[in-house]
Curated annotation (Swiss-Prot):
It comes from Mannheimia succiniciproducens (strain KCTC 0769BP / MBEL55E). It comes from the Bacteria. GO terms for biological process: nucleotide-excision repair; SOS response. This is UvrABC system protein C. Belongs to the UvrC family. GO terms for cellular component: cytoplasm; excinuclease repair complex. The keyword Aminoacyl-tRNA synthetase does not apply. Interacts with UvrB in an incision complex. Pfam families: GIY-YIG (PF01541), HHH_5 (PF14520), UVR (PF02151), UvrC_RNaseH (PF22920), UvrC_RNaseH_dom (PF08459). InterPro entries: GIY-YIG_endonuc (IPR000305), GIY-YIG_endonuc_sf (IPR035901), GIY-YIG_UvrC_Cho (IPR047296), Hlx-hairpin-Hlx_DNA-bd_motif (IPR003583), RuvA_2-like (IPR010994), UVR_dom (IPR001943), UVR_dom_sf (IPR036876), UvrABC_protein_C (IPR050066). The lineage of its organism: Bacteria, Pseudomonadati, Pseudomonadota, Gammaproteobacteria, Pasteurellales. One of its GO terms (molecular function) is excinuclease ABC activity.
Length: 608
């Protein structure tokens, strides 16, 4: 039992962070305090403030503290620890994806593209956007308004004539000399930059001036092009403006809570435009106040530096925060400029907070409906299989094209549905092409032939396939030499049947040695179809990426002595990869930088 008196006798009154551990030496809670002794003493009073705190204190076996120089430093360290340890009594933001941006590169002929992750590429970044779909939509729009290139540099550097994008008026073809001057191209780049910065009126003023000058010079064809561009830009501006009032860069955060589920809805506004919105469903311990939830969300959301998120000038929330000053100070330090958190909004901005609140309520209602349905599906599957409680399910599928670029996927469901952070793909190598049994065996060994934490052991493993695939899976598990209980998972084959029609699947249950055909309206079948389809889609998308990578590689990458510059020279002088393949050894040797010996090596590699 934890001796709180003995522990508290050695705690100082400094600011800092504390970590509470249970009997398994797992961090169960992380907190911070401006006075560690005072804060930690409050946990061991006779009358605790909530059942959540009572349950937490009952689980404590030891506590560690870290002294910091300030409250701000403690706040940052607290969020780093929460991110690292994922304690069960803390509010946890489960979405861990970095946000996508639009990147305008810094080159002679800049390109515009999407970017996610660390900002290593030199250029200007615009965003963040709430999801990849918003970036794709904006890029498509920009291409229609301002015809600048979006192609990769490898494509740009090796073109001898303009591509289809030039033919349909979506690129000025800077890749081929004589089609557009650097000045004209960079003018369109400037328009795109101003547009992304929200300076739409400047874009219009420039275009109107160009149109009028072309008209005065009797160049009516050029004037008509500018007129069409002006109309397109005006049409977009009318749709994108939030209001006539110019708004600061801001995020608006609203929270809805019901039946143990919280929805945090974020509305992103940049340069006076709504870039989009997104709903989050953090894991919230019982009896957590919504103010605490908001504070924790803001901290985790903006202080995870590796996410590449931009901190806006203003963050608007729908409730008062106790740690508002500390959060503002920390976010200001992180951003390198003044950041304000506003919790008492009036006037025009209040209607956007109301909009965020409406969206939070709507998203929560949908989530509750889906959670209820998933619960019913789990309940029916548990009854069908005679399992008291299903906590975790995993499903495997194989994807390839004619035995090439084989990928195996593993998707994971918990009681709330898909657990995408645990999804995995496996490259399958060293097998006969098209041997799905061998591919499944390799995938299962990669997944399970290692130590697993107790909560990571699945209750059910679905194998997308018939008896053959299931028998191969059983063989793998029989041969596993692992410490965890390999007999716990139920291995179930999902066979499509003779007609391979959806709804006519046969379940082959290994432990019960029986086969089941469920009716089309079975909730258990719907759950199985959901996880099977997720696995199928995950495998196909991974296979397509691998196939596309193989397709786009020239075949020169693996030849020793052929680096990026020599590869580029070969493609340029011989007219692309087909020209390289058709070239004789002497023709290859005539390319600058390619010796006779290297030409022989290249020729042999491509033809043998």
């Amino acid at each position: 039992m934890f001796d709180s008196k003995k522990f508290l006798a050695n705690v100082t009154h400094d600011p800092g962070v504390y970590r509470m551990f249970d009997d398994k030496d797992t961090v169960i809670y992380v907190g911070k305090a401006k006075d560690l002794k005072k804060r930690l003493s409050s946990y061991f009073r006779a009358n605790l403030s909530s059942k959540k705190t009572e349950a937490l204190v009952a689980s404590i076996c030891r506590i560690e503290t870290t002294i910091t120089t300030s409250e701000t430093e403690a706040l940052l360290l607290e969020h780093n620890y929460i991110k690292t340890f994922q304690p069960r009594y803390n509010v946890l933001l489960r979405d861990d994806k970095s946000y996508p941006y639009i990147l305008l590169t810094k080159e002679r002929h800049p390109r515009i593209t999407s970017h996610r992750g660390s900002k290593k590429v030199t250029g200007e970044y615009f965003g963040p956007y709430p999801h990849a779909g918003a970036v794709r939509e904006t890029l498509s729009l920009l291409q229609k308004l301002f015809p600048i290139r979006q192609c990769e540099n490898s494509v740009y550097a090796n073109r001898s004539r303009p591509c289809l994008q030039y033919q349909i008026g979506r690129c000025l073809a800077p890749c081929v000399s004589g089609y557009v001057s650097d000045e004209e191209y960079n003018q369109q780049v400037g328009y795109a930059r101003l547009f992304l910065q929200g300076k739409d009126q400047q874009v219009l003023d420039h275009l109107i001036g160009k149109m009028e000058r072309a008209s005065r010079a009797l160049n009516f064809e050029e004037a008509a092009r500018y007129r069409d561009q002006i109309q397109a830009v005006r049409s977009v501006i009318e749709k994108q403006f939030v209001s006539n009032e110019r708004l600061d860069d801001m995020d608006i955060i609203a929270i809805a809570y019901k039946l143990g589920i919280a929805c945090v809805h974020v509305l992103f506004i940049r340069q006076g435009k709504i870039l989009g919105n997104r709903s989050y469903f953090p894991k919230v311990p019982e009896n957590t106040s919504l103010s605490e939830l908001t504070e924790t969300f803001v901290g985790q959301f903006y202080l995870q530096a590796h996410q590449g998120r931009t901190i806006p000038n203003s963050i608007i929330v729908d409730r008062k925060l106790e740690e508002k000053a500390e959060l503002e100070s920390l976010l200001t330090d992180q951003a390198g400029r003044k950041v304000s958190i506003q919790d008492n909004i009036k006037g025009n901005k209040s209607k956007y907070l109301h909009l965020a609140q409406m969206n939070a309520q709507a998203a929560l209602a949908l989530q509750l409906k889906q959670s209820s349905l998933i619960h019913e599906r789990y309940k029916e599957l548990q009854q069908l299989l005679g399992i008291e409680k299903i906590h975790r399910m995993e499903c495997f599928d194989i994807s390839h094209t004619m035995g090439q670029q084989t990928i195996a996927s593993c998707v994971v469901f918990n009681e709330e549905g898909p657990l995408k952070s645990d999804y995995r793909r496996f490259n399958i190598e060293g097998i006969t092409g098209g041997d799905d049994y061998a591919a499944m065996e390799q995938a299962l060994k990669k997944r399970y032939d290692k130590d697993l934490e107790l909560e990571k052991i699945p209750d059910i493993i679905f194998i997308d396939g018939g008896k053959g695939q299931l028998n191969r899976a059983l063989k793998v598990f029989h041969e596993l030499q692992v410490k965890w209980d390999k007999n716990r998972p139920h291995l179930i084959g999902v066979a499509k049947g003779v007609d391979r029609k959806v709804g006519l699947e046969t379940l082959i249950i290994s432990k019960q040695e029986r086969e089941i055909n469920l009716p089309a309206d079975s909730l258990a079948l719907h759950l199985i179809q959901h996880i099977r389809d997720e696995s199928h889609n995950h495998a196909i998308s991974g296979h397509r990426k691998k196939r596309q990578k193989a397709f786009t590689q020239s075949g020169l990458e693996t030849i020793e002595g052929v680096g990026a510059k020599r590869r580029q020279a070969l493609l340029k002088y011989l007219g692309g990869m087909q020209g390289v393949k058709n070239a004789t050894q002497d023709e290859i040797a005539s390319v600058p930088g390619i010796s006779v010996a290297l030409a022989e090596k290249i020729f042999e590699a491509l033809h043998h």
